[in-house]
Amino acid sequence: MQVHERSHTGGHTCQCNHGSEKKAPATGKVHSEGGSARMSLLILVSIFLCAASIMFLVYKHFPQLSEEEREKIKVPRDMDDAKALGKVLSKYKDTFYVEVLVAYFTTYIFLQTFAIPGSIFLSILSGFLYPFPLALFLVCLCSGLGASFSYLLSYLVGRPVVYKYLSDKAIKWSQQVERHRDHLINYIIFLRITPFLPNWFINITSPVINVPLKVFFLGTFIGVAPPSFVAIKAGTTLYQLTTAGEAVSWNSVIILMVLAVLSILPAIFQKKLKKKFE
């Protein structure tokens, strides 16, 4: 892993220098890494502002709304917001089908790309607005694309930030990834179903520890389907819910755990067969 190699190289350099020469390169390296991290953060903020501008254009091209309806067009922060937003969108969905769909699609991807809370409510909302097959495909596609854009942002400009703030955690996860390298897609699916690692952490560290983008996208697309299934089904009874937690029952949790185990079983059997024939 690059994080590990980087620290190893730094340690080797320090051992080869003596006296005052030993401190100068280390200080220069700290300033260099700090500057790189700051520059990366500035670039990320610039990209975020550009994406926010696109979101504003989508909002401006939305159908003409009343003042009361405009106040409800916002990223939902709780179930009341989701209900209010669902009421407005359902009113315009049939007449302005494409506009509503594009607004939903871009908003979901925007939230996923920049790890902004609220996508769980959009998943629930999709079950209220659309037929189940379309809703499930939409949520999986938006999750896969949004996570992949987050991956690409980290690949292009986020590495210094990961090195500076998350290197220890990234090294630990890199070791896990190496153990599952032969069945990586199953491992990604397992992580997406289970809550063991935050999604934002998976997104930004995957390019640093050499998880291929194709595997990352497919693992995410498939892995988010089971939890999304639960949220979308809950969306059919949107107005009976008072919190997002009510969308998840004990039956749902058990089903998710079973699916998580099933996703990792091929890898377990593959390891056992490999040991048997060696």
From Swiss-Prot:
Region spans: Disordered: 1-31
Region annotated VTT domain, chain positions: 127-238
Domain of life (superkingdom): Eukaryota
Its membrane topology: Multi-pass membrane protein
Main location: endoplasmic reticulum
InterPro entries the UniProt entry points to: TM41A/B (IPR045014), VTT_dom (IPR032816)
Record's signal peptide: none
Domain description: The VTT domain was previously called the SNARE-assoc domain. As there is no evidence that this domain associates with SNARE proteins, it was renamed as VMP1, TMEM41, and TVP38 (VTT) domain.
Name of this chain's protein: Transmembrane protein 41B
The keyword Transport appears for this protein: yes
Keyword Cell wall biogenesis/degradation assigned: no
Matching PANTHER family: PTHR43220, TRANSMEMBRANE PROTEIN 41B
Any single GO CC term annotated in Swiss-Prot or TrEMBL for this entry: endoplasmic reticulum membrane
Gene label: tmem41b
Record key words, sorted: Autophagy, Endoplasmic reticulum, Lipid transport, Membrane, Neurogenesis, Transmembrane, Transmembrane helix, Transport
Described purpose of this protein according to its UniProt entry: Phospholipid scramblase involved in lipid homeostasis and membrane dynamics processes. Has phospholipid scramblase activity toward cholesterol and phosphatidylserine, as well as phosphatidylethanolamine and phosphatidylcholine. Required for autophagosome formation: participates in early stages of autophagosome biogenesis at the endoplasmic reticulum (ER) membrane by reequilibrating the leaflets of the ER as lipids are extracted by atg2 (atg2a or atg2b) to mediate autophagosome assembly.
Protein's cellular compartments: Endoplasmic reticulum membrane; Endomembrane system
Record field: transmembrane: 39-59, 96-116, 132-154, 184-204, 212-232, 249-269
GO biological process: autophagosome assembly; nervous system development
Gene Ontology terms for molecular function: phospholipid scramblase activity
Catalysed reaction, written as an equation: a 1,2-diacyl-sn-glycero-3-phospho-L-serine(in) = a 1,2-diacyl-sn-glycero-3-phospho-L-serine(out); cholesterol(in) = cholesterol(out); a 1,2-diacyl-sn-glycero-3-phosphocholine(in) = a 1,2-diacyl-sn-glycero-3-phosphocholine(out); a 1,2-diacyl-sn-glycero-3-phosphoethanolamine(in) = a 1,2-diacyl-sn-glycero-3-phosphoethanolamine(out)
Family label: Belongs to the TMEM41 family.
